[in-house]
């Protein structure tokens, strides 16, 4: 990358910067915000899928398949990623999949459950995201991301 940093170092700086911004908010408020965020995200994902069928999305938007599993859980398969397209157009492909891993940190800090085994940033065919309003999510980059991309 242009800054002459190793890819892992870039990702770790991105994670640290975002973690510091997010943790300014007290933990109790973060957990409350997490529930609200997931509820809103669930509604927006369903509407996004409808807009997608009508071809009303910006070229840098996400292409998704949305599935409601239960009141607590929903899944989104992302088949086209706006961030990946943008990173590519600005010759910043090396930011991925490091930025993809942010989902784990944000879910962990907000007290939501999150799982994923594939990402477009890792070269997979989709990002297979599973969100839980109530649940656990580990943020442990030191353990690596094999099996939880």
Model-predicted segments: where are they?
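Amphipathic interaction/junction segments at domain boundaries or subunit interfaces
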Residues: 1-90
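Short terminal or interdomain "cap/linker" segment that borders an active site or interface and mediates
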Residues: 61, 65-96, 104-149
């Amino acid at each position: 990358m242009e800054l002459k940093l190793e890819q892992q170092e870039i990702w770790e700086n991105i994670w640290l910067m975002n973690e510091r911004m997010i943790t300014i908010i007290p933990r109790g408020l973060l957990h409350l915000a997490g529930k609200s965020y997931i509820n809103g995200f669930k509604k927006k994902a369903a509407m996004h899928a409808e807009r997608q069928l009508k071809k009303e999305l910006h070229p840098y938007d996400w292409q998704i398949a949305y599935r409601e599993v239960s009141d607590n859980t929903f899944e989104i398969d992302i088949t086209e990623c706006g961030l990946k397209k943008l990173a590519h157009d600005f010759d910043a492909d090396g930011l991925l999949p490091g930025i993809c891993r942010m989902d784990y940190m944000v879910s962990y800090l907000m007290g939501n459950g999150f799982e994923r085994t594939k990402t477009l940033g890792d070269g997979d065919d989709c990002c297979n995201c599973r969100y839980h309003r109530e649940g656990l999510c580990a943020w442990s980059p030191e353990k690596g991301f094999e099996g939880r991309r």
